[in-house]
Swiss-Prot record:
Residues 150-206 form the BTB domain. Pfam families: BTB_BTBDG, BTBD16_C. It comes from the Eukaryota. Coiled coil: none annotated. PANTHER family: BTB/POZ DOMAIN-CONTAINING PROTEIN 16, BTB_POZ DOMAIN-CONTAINING PROTEIN 16. This is BTB/POZ domain-containing protein 16. Gene3D superfamilies: Potassium Channel Kv1.1, Chain A. InterPro entries: BTB_BTBDG (IPR056426), BTBD16 (IPR042833), BTBD16_C (IPR048859), SKP1/BTB/POZ_sf (IPR011333). The lineage of its organism: Eukaryota, Metazoa, Chordata, Craniata, Vertebrata. Transmembrane segments: none annotated.
Length: 506
């Protein structure tokens, strides 16, 4: 049964200026209707329009009148018009600067309207002062004191001072150390120009030590441009850069999950990606560790857990199961690597049995990966990080007895090409990582479905290049042994080149 409130909305008496007037307490306007009417007369604004959104209307009018060439002419001299009480300090401000901040403008207009007796006279004085450029000395306007309470711990006095300084100057330098505080200050002040400037600064300063805080700031303020940039940057740098530093510990789990699911993710191999993710888990469980351990130390740690069940089926490992479901364990084909995975008792036995069975069937059928259908989500991934000092760079990979060389070539200062080529096992110098315990296929041809992609950062924007998905038979004799080449023109460096392929049934 619905209860009805029989109590009618009462009007309350409030003294505004020298009069005694009625108003509804639920009214959206912070003063009263007569005061609003007075302001509309001064500003030459239609009262009906003002009633729809009085705060926004008044602020926009003042902004239009006050934000002129003062921003380009340096700081303003003269006596302050407004005293801002905030963070235990009293900050002296001027009208043209106040109206760049919606928060300060609302506080100021509220205080001005509620000030005793002279709301209309003060408005007329302010408008008169700023309407004539020839006027060198302003008429005295009574100083208004406004207060702003800030509870955000990110806003320090130094950061807030920098934010207020940006009201007066276009070029105020921000560092990585204070940009988050200035961003928080700009958000509270509703100072859009400064907020965009902070975001731009953060976009250009993504590093292993800033990625966490910048991403969380993007989430906090719902700034999609910043969160997307963090995701793209980490997708490229998780394995080659962040995974080699202690900052890996601070990557938030939601961000890590998004990156692992990203089709743009760069990795040297599936096993490199697995090692990076294992290291992240190790660092979550060993908070006092200040440097990355060697690989053997990490393996010994996971091997020390009870053998009654695997790590991912125990606490806290179970909570990280979604992360490891993103991996393509079928892309790890080295017997040594698979034995290592089995030894640490990290994954459910059913996962390892399925991977081993798929490898067995692929070897038995000459390399056919009948269990893989979708190149974009199931392909085996390999990568080259082409650095500035390289003119040619290549790596050799072995899968089910087939050997391929993935290669990048620099043709001139801005021209590059990336390709893959099938090679004979007899052409190898047999580095242990490729030849040791490898099977050798005697098949003269191998059907391969592949795609080559390259990405690089230029002026804060990612350039992306790629071939289509290509189906090709690889033999040993040119030109049949070589893939299509991905040719690109870019000034970006380094270049992240990714090779994805599967062996369809043939």
């Amino acid at each position: 049964m619905k209860m009805l409130n029989s109590r009618k909305i009462r009007m309350e008496r409030r003294i505004v200026g020298a009069t005694n007037r009625w108003r509804f307490p639920q009214d959206h306007f912070c003063g009263d209707l007569l005061a609003l009417s007075q302001m509309c007369n001064v500003l030459n604004v239609d009262l009906d329009d003002a009633l729809k959104n009085p705060d926004k209307l008044c602020i926009s009018k003042f902004q239009k009148l006050f934000t002129e060439s003062i921003m380009d002419s340096g700081t303003q001299s003269g006596e302050a018009d407004v005293i801002l009480d905030c963070l235990g300090f009293k900050w002296e401000l001027h009208h043209p600067q106040i109206f760049q901040s919606e928060t300060l403008a609302k506080l100021y207009l509220t205080a001005l309207i509620q000030n005793t007796k002279s709301s209309q006279r003060d408005l007329e004085k302010i408008l008169k002062v700023h309407s004539t450029e020839r006027m060198k000395k302003r008429s005295p306007v009574k100083k208004i004191i406004i207060s702003l309470r800030i509870n955000d711990p990110a806003v320090t006095r130094v950061a807030f001072a920098l934010a207020l300084k940006n009201l007066y100057m276009n070029e105020v330098e921000m560092t990585v150390d204070n940009v988050l505080g200035v961003l928080a200050s700009a958000h509270i002040l509703q100072f859009n120009r400064l907020f965009r400037k902070c975001v731009s600064t953060m976009l250009n300063r993504l590093t292993p030590c800033t990625i966490k805080n910048f991403y969380l700031a993007g989430c906090k303020y719902k700034e999609e441009q910043l969160t997307n940039a963090c995701e793209k940057w980490l997708a490229m740098n998780l394995v080659p850069l962040v995974g080699t530093q202690i900052h890996l510990r601070h990557i938030p789990e939601p961000l890590l999950y998004k990156v692992l699911k990203s089709p743009r993710l760069f990795t040297f191999s599936e096993f490199h990606l697995l090692k990076t993710l294992l290291m992240w888990v190790y660092l979550q469980m060993n908070g006092k560790v200040q440097t990355l351990p060697i690989h053997e130390t990490m393996l010994a740690f996971f091997s020390s857990f009870p053998k009654k069940s695997c790590f991912l089926e125990q606490d806290p490992g179970h909570s990280w199961m979604p992360l490891f479901l993103c991996l393509r364990l079928h892309g790890i084909t080295s017997g040594k690597d698979l034995e290592e995975i089995k030894h640490i008792n990290f994954f459910p036995e059913s996962w390892l049995v399925r991977v081993t069975a798929n490898h067995y069937h692929a070897l038995e059928s000459g390399g056919n990966m009948v269990h893989l259908k979708d190149l974009s989500t199931q392909a085996m991934r390999f990568g080259l990080l082409f650095r500035q000092e390289y003119t040619t760079y290549s790596e050799t990979i072995s899968i089910y007895g087939y050997f391929f060389e993935i290669k990048g070539i620099k043709h001139d200062t801005t021209s590059y090409s990336f390709s893959m080529q099938r090679i004979r096992h007899t052409d190898l110098e047999c580095p242990s990582s490729v030849c040791e315990h490898s099977t050798i296929s005697l098949r003269s041809e191998r059907l391969v479905k592949y795609e080559i992609r390259a990405q690089t950062l230029v002026d804060g924007r990612w350039q992306e290049f790629g071939t289509n998905q290509i189906m090709q038979k690889f033999g040993f004799i040119k030109p049949g042994c070589k893939s299509h080449a991905l040719k690109i023109q870019t000034v970006g460096i380094p270049i992240y080149a990714s090779f994805a392929f599967i062996f369809p049934a043939s």
